[in-house]
Amino acid sequence: MASRLANVAIGVVLAITALSPAWAQGPGRGRGAEPPPPYRPAAGAKDLRSVLFNWTWYMGMLRGVDEHELVSSLEYQGKGTIQVDGQPCTLTKYRVSTSYQVSGQRVQYTCTRPNGRTVSNIEVVNGEYAWNEDIPGAELVAGKGNATPMPAAVQERLIRLWASPQGAPKAAIMAAAPSAELGANPGTLFKDGEMKAGETSLSWENGKPVITYPIPGVPGATATATLNEKYMAERVVVKQGAKTTEFIYGDYKDWNNPLNKIDALYAGKVTERHNGTVARDLTTDQTETGSVYVIMPVPASVRAAIHPAAPETLPKFELASAAPQGQTPRRADGHPDMTGNWNSAGMNWRYGNRRCDPTQQEGCSRALNQTMDFEFEAPSRFGPNRPEYKPEFWDKVQQLDEWTNKDDPVMTCQPLGNPRQGPPRRIVQSDKDIIFFYTQYADGGGGNNEYRIVPTDGRKHDPQKAIEATYYGYTVGNWEGDTLVLDSISFVDTTWLARGGFFHSDQMHVIEKLTRTGNGIKYEVTVDDPEVFVQPWVMTPKILTLNTNPEAGILAERADCEVYETKDISSQIRH
């Protein structure tokens, strides 16, 4: 799988939730009972609510028992012809990496003109910035590649993104409910009978639903999407002044890797016309839906050259958590007391057995859907915040993600390690040290009731102790005001930072900061790895809340761990 991050500063603070509803658990807890869907259109419904729901539902974009819209990215490969400088060019390579969460897309192509000349280019857009690259990730590392600012191309590239088979329903929903939570089910956002919400409207023409919505980030650009009988876009027309861009789509099916069929549909035929002239005529070879590492960091030279005109029109994916309440308890030494049981942050949806959608293949079952959807729902697989690897490592991350069932260390019972383990479930603090207790199922799976004992007396790293590499690193702690700072070095290089192939070297350096305010702890992590990162990765902060349940501190004994799969992998459905 592939996925690409952008350097756009978008914060996503994840809300706290339960992992599994009762009906998704074991015997005696309702196993086999079918949960009610969050929304089911009435028979014959022709309002905006039902059409937007069906559009995403039939496309396979709704995931999990609550049927959230969780398709965050797409890797696309195709063939055909494109227009280059007014001449047709036959493609020998055409790859598109799209991140819907950051309004970003990278198009890499190589083609041959009628005169035999080969043309190659890399066209990138990230929000309000557009540029061309001579190599992927040009200029991110000093002296490697050249990035050419292309301010005049921003609007054309954003139109292509937000008029695409998956981008169009996303843009229509965002325009209809701009304040909706990240990944909301469209059926829960509107009222029955509405034909217009926000800037999105619905009409019916020749028995087909027609959705009209604005293109994000492109002032004055209005898209009209005509859906077929299966609620998939067959034609999207974007008008902006005197320019008309038309997209024709057909042959929808699951084009994902045969080893990772996840019933997420995409168009097999794509035709793009500019004022009637064919600009791109493509046939799909393969897609990877929901790729975890799709990034397009903006080079400094591009930021300096382009001055955004209307960034406020771009989608912002943000979730806020409640502010901590109450007084902050302190120890006799004056430091905040971290002792207690804590609820860690996860996503705001539930795992479970999703009902089969209308276009799923024969043999679909709720149990299969639960396995299939996990790669969309796992906390560290969602959200736009990604480490910025050096470009030469991008393909390695994608390949590790493709074979995560074989390569993820957790599949062979290795500890999650730091920082993947995440925040502790229980903390015991003394004058000279602090003890962290962890539970299973950190990172939405894995972990095995580990613990750490960290000195907090302000000592420095001892070079002799730093010789030995461990899963959680050699950690020392000190207080900076009311913030406890943990400094960790000397890691093994066999753990991952998160799901999705986020590997690291043995030069990784991790700084954790814990700040207690009232009944909450703000948990912040910065990861530096000069061997593989362009710059330190500041992970999305998590807010821990005090759990006052007297049973919360009772942790199960360390469980047995079973190696889940052998090297003979018959499926790439990611965990």
Please name every model-derived segment:
Residues 10-13, 98-100:
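Intrinsically disordered, low-complexity proline-rich regions
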Residues 19-24:
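Sec/Tat signal peptide C-region and signal peptidase I cleavage site
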Residues 102-106, 208-209, 230-235, 254-269:
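A short glycine-rich beta-turn/N-cap micro-motif
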Residues 212-213:
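N-terminus-biased targeting/localization segments
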Residues 225-227:
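Short conserved beta-strand segments at catalytic cores or DNA/RNA-binding microdomains
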